[in-house]
């Protein structure tokens, strides 16, 4: 099983822009075009393509944001805008990619926690995150989405 997490570059940008979620997920996540524009405006975001067996199957953004809290004086590591392309959904790739992303972020940032935010009615995604140990912490992000955190 070959899983790769690759930065968005000129070489894969067109393919990244061609990734889409299914129709019923459109209200939960921005398009990759908007995501890449946001990453240009906020240098903390690191947009990546998610590859399985050489095929581009998904997208995510992550980063270390300088939010101070007692246990994480250097900031918070956030996983954001994670999705699997509609053509690859229903094949277990969400689980595989989330596991790989958690491991990648833990190694890259040497962090104690990973944060994400989610719409409270995105039940399928909430269940996935809960299976991987993410729990609601009672916070809301600046968009009013509920914050989940995973202790590493």
Swiss-Prot record:
Annotated family: Belongs to the acetyltransferase family.
GO terms of biological process kind: spermine catabolic process
InterPro entries, sorted: Acyl_CoA_acyltransferase (IPR016181), GNAT_dom (IPR000182), MshD_Acetyltransferase (IPR050276), Sper_AcTfrase_N (IPR027455)
Gene: bltD
Superkingdom as given in the UniProt entry: Bacteria
Protein name according to UniProt: Probable spermine N(1)-acetyltransferase
Binding sites annotated in the UniProt record for acetyl-CoA: 82-84, 89-95, 122-131
Pathway stated in the Swiss-Prot or TrEMBL entry: Amine and polyamine degradation; spermine degradation
């Amino acid at each position: 099983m070959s899983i790769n997490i690759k930065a968005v570059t000129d070489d894969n940008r067109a393919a990244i822009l061609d990734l889409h979620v299914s129709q019923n997920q459109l209200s939960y996540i921005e398009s990759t075009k908007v995501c890449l524009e946001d990453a240009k405006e906020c240098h903390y975001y690191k947009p990546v393509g998610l590859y399985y067996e050489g095929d581009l199957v998904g997208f995510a953004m992550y980063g270390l944001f300088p939010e101070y809290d007692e246990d994480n004086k250097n900031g918070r590591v956030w996983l954001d805008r994670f999705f699997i392309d509609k053509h690859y959904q229903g094949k277990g790739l969400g689980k595989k990619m989330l596991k790989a992303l958690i491991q990648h972020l833990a190694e890259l940032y040497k962090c104690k926690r990973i944060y994400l935010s989610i719409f409270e009615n995105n039940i399928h995604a909430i269940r996935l995150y809960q299976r991987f140990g993410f729990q609601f912490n009672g916070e809301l992000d600046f968009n009013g989405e509920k914050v989940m955190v995973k202790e590493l």
